[in-house]
Amino acid sequence: MSMRTEYCGLVTEHLLGQTVSLCGWVQRRRDHGGVIFIDLRDREGLVQVVCDPDRAEMFATAEGVRNEFCVQVKGLVRNRPEGTVNAGLKSGKIEVLCHELTVLNASVTPPFQLDDDNLSETTRLTHRVLDLRRPQMQHNLRLRYRVAIEARKYLDEQGFIDIETPMLTKSTPEGARDYLVPSRVNAGQFFALPQSPQLFKQLLMVANFDRYYQITKCFRDEDLRADRQPEFTQIDCETSFLGEQEIRDLFEDMIRHIFKTTIDVELDAKFPVMPYSEAMARFGSDKPDLRVKLEFTELTDAMKDVDFKVFSTPANTKDGRVAALRVPKGAELTRGDIDGYTEFVRIYGAKGLAWIKVNERAKGRDGLQSPIVKNLHDASIAAILERTGAQDGDIVFFAADRAKVVNDSLGALRLKIGHSEFGKANGLVESGWKPLWVVDFPMFEYDDEEARYVAAHHPFTSPKDEHLEYLETDPGRCLAKAYDMVLNGWEIGGGSVRIHREEVQSKVFRALKIGPEEAQAKFGFLLDALQYGAPPHGGIAFGLDRIVTMMAGADSIRDVIAFPKTQRAQCLLTQAPSPVDERQLRELHIRLRQPEQPKA
């Protein structure tokens, strides 16, 4: 008989009366009245093994096994006794009467029980091998595998070719910091790990491969958050001779296919499309969570002439904004709740949080409760009530500052209230999946520190045709042929139509204050390729980690990556990064500079 004939979790009634050989780990060992029960676990689940004292040698072995021992069991599949069926297990109607028990490897006492749901992330990541044995982690990584398989199936059916691109490439810092790799044979020179395969996939389009994809690692040396890792995985795609709408349709279908085939979720038949300007105006975010039924009300123009300087000053400032957020039934929020929200918005740069409770709208000023009402004239109050549509029992929150501060703070407050227990109880948030496309992004953003424009996405994104003239006259007016797919407030994919003409790419570099010599040094290979009849092309990249995190309902992408890094970009399992010896550094022509000691 083979070492293993069946997986533990797949032993069911169809094997009744048969002898099976199982391998796995001891989840739990119980001694009941002289009979030993072992819950045996493998990747497919659990099966109950019964060890009877009639088989003395086997029973003696069973008495010595402990949790996480790796064992082999040979035995007879039989029905469980009446009243002992476990409906929660696929194998819950049967058990295996053990004939032979072999310890394949003993285990020291684990540092935690695998069913402990209150482990710290540090403990889990330090003992990641044991953490990965837990059913939820097994589920997450198998879900990840299925998502990748379904993406490959779809792309294969659509004529895409899987082509690998280099991991050791050229550093072209235009965004996040690169991870650098020193070259031993080229002293003083460095490779960079790719932040994306962007330029190589464009070159593949010039090379007539027409449709490319790759599920690949990307690397960015940036500060980490719950949805970031220094190395992450993209479903990276590029296609020739398709316009923006056609590209969106193609990959919208892919995401629908993946959700249906992996978790049996039917996404919208057609995703809504929202311009960036509308998303920022209504939600203060370019990745709005449409499950939350709260929206901003624009008040900037109505607050220009009020005596209340908190509102009028930003209303009359070039980059200022005044916006309101009406919360239905919010008048029941306590002063403690409001104080908590006030402290919360300070995280995003807000200096405070103004509010008005609407007790009786018909009474006008006298029906309102607020510390700011005395600073507003009747016309301003009427404008606020009219524009927000506030009703009796509502509360209206206000933000007034630079537009970025208003958008960030009020946008975060919108999500916090919507997803709170109050929000759920009052129908301010829906369940389910709310996808959309956000389009027409600004081509450039102005960097005050560098006193120049920088690319909002990357410098290879095509401007909209009607905005080409602005590249040399007013870059800030340029909109890009860029698009992000957003799902429940997460950007799960982003892409654009690319620049395929060398003269346009050179104009974009000039708008970014990248001179001809610098452009040739950094991107000469691209500029050269674009001169050989480069086709119109565009693409998109999806964050595999993010998609699986959402599907699994996980708190962090670290829960869907086998061996992730911490928020300090460290691997607690292997203790990477770590020092290297002096000999290796000499071979790489590197001398470390010791950090300066603080002066006493």
Swiss-Prot record:
| Molecular-function GO term, any one | nucleic acid binding
Q: Which residues are involved in binding L-aspartate? A: 174, 220, 457, 498
User: Which enzyme class, named as a word?
Assistant: ligase
List the residue ranges of the region (Aspartate): 198-201
How is this protein annotated for GO cellular component? Answer: cytoplasm
Entry EC no(s): 6.1.1.23
Enumerate the PROSITE patterns for this protein.
AA_TRNA_LIGASE_II
Q: Which GO terms describe its biological process?
A: aspartyl-tRNA aminoacylation
- Entry's localization field: Cytoplasm
Q: What is its main location?
A: cytoplasm
* Pfam families the UniProt entry points to: GAD, tRNA-synt_2, tRNA_anti-codon
The UniProt annotation places ATP binding at 220-222, 229, 491, 543-546
Query: Catalysed reaction(s)?
Result: tRNA(Asx) + L-aspartate + ATP = L-aspartyl-tRNA(Asx) + AMP + diphosphate
Coiled-coil residue spans: none
Keywords attached to this entry:
Aminoacyl-tRNA synthetase, ATP-binding, Cytoplasm, Ligase, Nucleotide-binding, Protein biosynthesis
Keyword ATP-binding in the entry? The reply is yes
Family annotation (InterPro entries): Aa-tRNA-synt_II, aa-tRNA-synth_II, aa-tRNA-synth_II/BPL/LPL, Asp-tRNA-ligase_1, Asp-tRNA-ligase_1_N, Asp/Asn-tRNA-synth_IIb, AspRS_core, GAD-like_sf
**Which residue positions hold the site described Important for tRNA non-discrimination?**
32, 83
Q: Which HAMAP family match?
A: Asp_tRNA_synth_type1
Biological role = Aspartyl-tRNA synthetase with relaxed tRNA specificity since it is able to aspartylate not only its cognate tRNA(Asp) but also tRNA(Asn). Reaction proceeds in two steps: L-aspartate is first activated by ATP to form Asp-AMP and then transferred to the acceptor end of tRNA(Asp/Asn).
- Report quaternary structure and partners: Homodimer.
**Family in the record:** Belongs to the class-II aminoacyl-tRNA synthetase family. Type 1 subfamily.
User: Can you name this protein?
Assistant: Aspartate--tRNA(Asp/Asn) ligase
Designated gene of the protein: aspS
